[in-house]
Regions:
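Active-site-proximal loop/turn and secondary-structure-junction residues that shape catalytic pockets
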Residues: 67, 98-100, 117-119, 144-146, ...
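Structural alpha-beta junctions
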Residues: 86-92, 134-137, 184-194
Length: 229
């Protein structure tokens, strides 16, 4: 049976708000519904949440579930990176749709930097990520897939996630199973783990789901389970 990625990776919304302006943005709708900040297009930083990183029980954290890394002020990023360095028991993920706006180096061993790609025309984001963010770990999220991305240069990428449209617009967008399988085959050829999100079950079948995590994430989950015994 397929698993939900949210059971493996916890959101930590240190920054809320995004300047990208995607039409299908679930985060913007949630912020408006719950009145989290005044203006979603003007991101806010919540440094008090950094204390969550001090927990000893290891976690895999996504830090950009309600933001885009390109919209973080450099001083916010520096403060978060410093806290990440102090807490090697966790793994931390970042995502951006605008890697062209980033330019930094980091030697953090437990930080993963990724881009979202929804269509072939956005493949440039992968190259921009490798060029502009000089880091130890890279990942790519192909979600929601609007068309066939074709042949993808995944060199240097350590993990990919594949998914389709969810929520109210899910009936308007149809991801073909061949697109997901093509990405999976390309990644596996390079030894890259693939995680198919649970929303693909209706498209490719639960028995065909591939849900692989990087070894670093698996180690965190193993320690979590040992703490629960």
């Amino acid at each position: 049976m397929s698993i939900c990625i949210k059971d493996q990776i916890q959101n930590m919304n240190i920054v809320i708000g995004c300047t990208v302006g995607c039409a299908y943005c679930y985060a913007r709708n949630n912020v408006k519904r719950w009145h989290m900040i005044d203006d979603f297009a003007d991101p806010d930083f919540f440094p008090g949440k950094l204390k969550m990183m001090e927990k000893k029980r290891p976690q895999n954290f996504l830090l950009t579930g309600m933001s885009d890394l390109s919209g973080w002020k450099p001083e916010w990023r520096d403060e978060v990176f410093a806290k990440i360095r102090e807490n090697p028991q966790h793994q931390f993920l970042f995502l951006t749709k605008r890697p062209d706006l980033l330019d930094f180096d980091t030697d953090l061993e437990n930080a993963w930097f990724g881009v979202t790609v929804t269509r072939k025309a956005e493949l440039w984001r992968i190259d921009a990520l490798r060029k502009n963010v000089r880091a130890k770990h890279y990942h790519v999220t192909f979600e929601p897939l609007f068309d066939d991305p074709g042949t993808v240069d995944l060199s240097g990428i350590n993990w990919i996630v594949v998914g389709t449209m969810t929520g109210a617009q899910r009936r308007k967008i149809h991801t073909e199973p061949e697109w997901a399988w093509s990405l999976t085959d390309q990644a596996h050829t390079l030894g890259i783990p693939v995680f198919m999100k649970e929303d693909l079950v209706s498209i490719i079948g639960d028995e065909n789901m591939i849900q692989e995590m990087p070894e670093e994430f698996n180690k965190v989950l193993e320690v979590q389970r040992s703490w629960q015994k």
